[in-house]
Amino acid sequence: MDLPGPIHDFLLVFLGSGLLFGSIGVVLFTNPIFSAFSLGFVLVCISLLYILSNSHFVAAAQLLIYVGAITVLIIFAVMFMNDSEYSTDLNRWTVGDGITSLICTTILFSLISTILDTSWYGVIWTTRLNQILEQDLISNSQQIGIHLSTDFFLPFELISIILLVALIGAISVARQ
């Protein structure tokens, strides 16, 4: 969006703080319904940040897929859970939980180090080369594919990692 500097900075800080408080709410709420609504708020803040950075396609996909479908599905699934089953096991910490936490922390730090060590200048050169190719393409789906693999590569990968974690969590909850 073409906003004046102070308004853009205010919206960035406002959405960032909303994202931070919403994500803290996802983790700290003991009621799963409140946690799911807080997740929906986080996903809306992320899509508004995409709009603020002129990534309208990714913002629309974020709103339609994650806020519109995934969050509603999570709330629907949480409403059918047996509440007494989860309230009695809150204070248990098993060896498997510790191993899982260690593995997830290791994966998180390896992802952070990979992102920090990646030379993003090569991605800029790839984008400039693909702009020449983009003019010759006829199909919109090919243009979307090029944009997802160049301009929106990092958000696309982060969203896919979030989906993978949600899928693994849903499978582990379903197996119990």
From Swiss-Prot:
EC numbers on record: 7.1.1.-
GO function term, MF aspect, one: NADH dehydrogenase (ubiquinone) activity
Keyword rRNA processing assigned: no
Main subcellular location: plastid
Keywords of this entry: Chloroplast, Membrane, NAD, NADP, Plastid, Plastoquinone, Quinone, Thylakoid, Translocase, Transmembrane, Transmembrane helix, Transport
Reactions this protein catalyses: a plastoquinone + NADH + (n+1) H(+)(in) = a plastoquinol + NAD(+) + n H(+)(out); a plastoquinone + NADPH + (n+1) H(+)(in) = a plastoquinol + NADP(+) + n H(+)(out)
Domain of life (superkingdom): Eukaryota
Subcellular location: Plastid, Chloroplast thylakoid membrane
Residue intervals passing through the bilayer: 10-30, 32-52, 61-81, 95-115, 152-172
Membrane topology according to the record: Multi-pass membrane protein
Pfam families for this protein: Oxidored_q3 (PF00499)
Gene Ontology CC annotations of this record: chloroplast thylakoid membrane
Family: Belongs to the complex I subunit 6 family.
Function: NDH shuttles electrons from NAD(P)H:plastoquinone, via FMN and iron-sulfur (Fe-S) centers, to quinones in the photosynthetic chain and possibly in a chloroplast respiratory chain. The immediate electron acceptor for the enzyme in this species is believed to be plastoquinone. Couples the redox reaction to proton translocation, and thus conserves the redox energy in a proton gradient.
Subunit structure: NDH is composed of at least 16 different subunits, 5 of which are encoded in the nucleus.
Protein name per Swiss-Prot or TrEMBL: NAD(P)H-quinone oxidoreductase subunit 6, chloroplastic
